[in-house]
Amino acid sequence: MANLRTNFLGVEIKNPVGVTSCDFGGNTRLAKRVIDKGIGWLVGKTVHKIDGPHRWPRPYFYSLKKFGPELRDSWTCSQMFHNMPYEQWLETEGPATLKLCRENDCLFIPSVSGIGTDPDTWIPFCKDMENMGCDMIELDTGGPHATFGAVAAHKDVGAPLAMDPDTAYKVTKACVDAVKIPIIFKMTPQCVNMAALALAVERAGAAGISANNAFYGTWIDHETASFYGGPFSCGGLMGRAWQLFSLAKVLEITATVKIPVIGIGGIFTWDDCVRYMMGGCHVTGLCSALYSRGVGVLKDVIDGISAFMDRKGYKSVDEFIGVCVPEFSYIRDWPKEEAPMKYPSPIIPVFDLEKCNNCGICEKLCPYGAVEIHKNKGPIINEHCMGCAWCQGHCPKDAVTMILKETGETIWNGRGLPSKWCK
């Protein structure tokens, strides 16, 4: 039986699956809904004193599902930080949520936001969390809304802080020096140089990093010739497809620094969690999936990881955390054939006719017009084949293998990495 217990910043947790900062960490009623599913950790809804308690522009969730099946899990969102006055939260929901989590073997991580780049506005929150008895604190510096504050003094609140290494260092260092519990810095995917930012907060003494917050986005309703939901950029690109971008950003961090990382962004399934952990994350968190698929997805994810570990023979999650990080590199470093590229391609697809059902998808989708379906011979490639593997990726029967034409050597079977056939 797989052991999902792991250690995160000195705290042993029952499994690496948690819920990131959202409604479900905002009060005990909602927190109980996800805690009851067996999560190992929970981040609170971000508390703050920016312009007083936030008033979310109701309605504030704008699902894009009606615009096509490709967008079934995507939405934009103008919900902001916690809408409860900070002092009220500090006296009621904060301590109550911490107590609820501890009673259920669930790590509670409060999330706080000061005002922009002024460290003095962050320190009081950190001291309050420490006095409350919290084990660690998340600095939510990566909010996707362009500007939270309504006045000029607040123009750098949110993502701008998490895009500048010098400013991030200054705020992180001040918070680290102010308390004795670990500080976690939350990143924004808007940051161009994640490695530089990660190095800055590690140097400042951050114990961990959360990556990534949501990106920003907007949508136009073509039927009404107007914006959909709101005429502004707000939290967007939520959904599983977002994972491709976020995971790449995460790897820029895990390949650069040694401090633990909370993996966030487009996680919907158990294998998404495994993917982030193999990419170097110590724990992984869900958010959007709870809204578009329901809180029951959490138990499915936890059970799925356990079953995967049993199937693969992993005894502990530590055995596969970071296994892909050493391989992460730049495309410029991948072996390539000598210029110019050979034509016709030395790499071609071969089709397993016992699996092929002549569906014609490869012929239809080949961008080079290089595949022709013959009734009795199956797919036949012509001289225009570029060896791109597009047909392989779209074959519903897994009937395509990429080979080196000259020798018949298998170059890629559609799983993992292709062979480095260029010497």
Predicted regions, residues:
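Iron-sulfur cluster-binding cysteine motifs and their immediate structural context
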Residues: 361-378, 390-407
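N-terminal capping/small domains of soluble enzymes
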Residues: 1-108, 113-118, 124
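Alpha/beta enzyme core
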Residues: 36-37, 115-262, 268-275, 279-283, ...
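Extended, intrinsically disordered, low-complexity segments
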Residues: 65-69, 243, 303-353, 357, ...
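Short pre-active-site segment immediately N-terminal to redox-active cysteine/selenocysteine motifs
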Residues: 354-355, 365, 384, 394
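C-terminal helical cap(s) of enzyme catalytic domains, especially alpha/beta-barrels
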Residues: 54-71, 218-235, 289-314, 415-420
